[in-house]
Amino acid sequence: MTLSDLRDYFKSDFPWKESISVGKIDKNKERAVCFYHSKVSRPKINTIGGKGNRSYTVLPISILLRFGKNYEAAAEKAEEIYNFFDEKTFDLNNERVFVISPYNAPIDLGTDDQGVFENSLEFDLYITKKGD
């Protein structure tokens, strides 16, 4: 599974009509969401017998949300996206995905230089092949 696959899943199942990207957010837009590989360190998964015996992989992701200059609206939208993903299970590209956040809520990042509120949403995607 790639971040583009996840972006496309979000685009098809969540009511979001604003800017959406992978790897680089459009800072010219007041409303935008971007999917990144997480920079938060996670422990390595070791499997007895090697990677071929592993039944799942973990993909840590970060979602950056820019959502206008109203704090309440930005916090509400961040919570909506958080609730859309947290503790969710879905199938994508012949893989089963289990989503867990290491945090209890979105992370409020404050505003950028233009006064646009930003939130970070952190998730770990546990991915198994369907049938495993």
For the regions a language model picked out, list residue spans one by one:
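Small/polar-rich, solvent-exposed N-terminal microdomains that initiate assembly or binding
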Residues: 1-51, 88
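Short, solvent-exposed beta-strand/turn "edge" segments of beta-rich domains on protein surfaces
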Residues: 49-55, 112-116
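Oligomerization/assembly interface segments of phage tail-like spikes and tubes
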Residues: 55-69, 117-128
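Mid-chain, well-packed structural core segment of small domains
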Residues: 67-90
